């Protein structure tokens, strides 16, 4: 008697049993590992490698009892677990994992964009002196000169009542003043000097004409 005949006679004694686990407890796609590889290593496609799962499981336990009780729920209701709890797929897990993980490169990009936008806004809000309005409604305060500045300007006026542009720049740098302030001071000082000499000298009218011409040349 061959071994194949003996095996067939042995397994024919037991009826075909159902699956070890009751139907409906586990879905077909329980996890990523079971979904990706339906066959396990060690079980080939040859006739000698196949093994009937139902009959073997039925033979392992006496009285045809299954591994788990034949109840519709695997765990009691107090655990709060049902058949839908085991139906896990790969795509929701990967989506949740990718949403929880933060990308440092994206954060650096957003910070760089915010910094560029702030610099751009500061550049737009920057106001230069030539952009300010020079209307008549602006009230300018009276310029006050220190004693040292007044003394140096008086000494310069004593030698030269009219200044060249180069000399005006030199005095402005020396006294920490602007060219406009030097020019205004000399204009006011010349007007004062004219008033002082008008009453003392009768020939003041003849001196006013060349002075006005020089003032026009200086303003240009």
UniProtKB/Swiss-Prot annotation:
Pfam family, one: Homeodomain
Gene3D superfamilies assigned: Homeodomain-like (1.10.10.60)
Residues spanned by motif Antp-type hexapeptide: 127-132
Region annotation Disordered: where it falls in the sequence: 195-220
Origin: domain of life: Eukaryota
SMART domains: HOX
Transmembrane intervals: none
Subcellular location: Nucleus
Residue ranges of DNA binding: 138-197
Function field: Sequence-specific transcription factor which is part of a developmental regulatory system that provides cells with specific positional identities on the anterior-posterior axis.
Annotated protein name in UniProt: Homeobox protein Hox-B7-B
Organism, as annotated: Xenopus laevis (African clawed frog)
Biological classification of the source: Eukaryota, Metazoa, Chordata, Craniata, Vertebrata
Name of the coding gene: hoxb7-b
């Amino acid at each position: 008697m061959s071994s194949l005949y003996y095996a067939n006679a042995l397994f024919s004694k037991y009826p075909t049993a159902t699956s070890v686990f009751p139907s409906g407890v586990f879905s077909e796609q329980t996890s990523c590992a079971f979904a990706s590889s339906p066959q396990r290593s060690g079980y080939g496609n040859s006739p000698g490698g196949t093994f009937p799962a139902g009959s073997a499981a039925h033979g392992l336990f006496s009285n045809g009892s299954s591994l788990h009780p034949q109840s519709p729920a695997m765990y009691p209701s107090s655990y709060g677990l049902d058949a839908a709890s085991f139906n896990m797929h790969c795509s929701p897990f990967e989506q949740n994992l990718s949403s929880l993980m933060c990308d440092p490169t994206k954060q650096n990009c957003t910070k760089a964009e915010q910094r560029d936008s702030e610099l751009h806004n500061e550049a737009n809000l920057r106001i230069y002196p030539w952009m300010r309005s020079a209307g008549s409604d602006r009230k300018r305060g009276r310029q006050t000169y220190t004693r040292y500045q007044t003394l140096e300007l008086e000494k310069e006026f004593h030698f030269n009542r009219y200044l060249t542009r180069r000399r005006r720049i030199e005095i402005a740098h020396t006294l920490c003043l602007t060219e406009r302030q030097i020019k205004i001071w000399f204009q006011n000082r010349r007007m004062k000097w004219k008033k002082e000499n008008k009453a003392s000298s009768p020939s003041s009218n003849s001196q006013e004409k060349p002075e006005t011409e020089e003032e026009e040349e200086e303003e240009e």
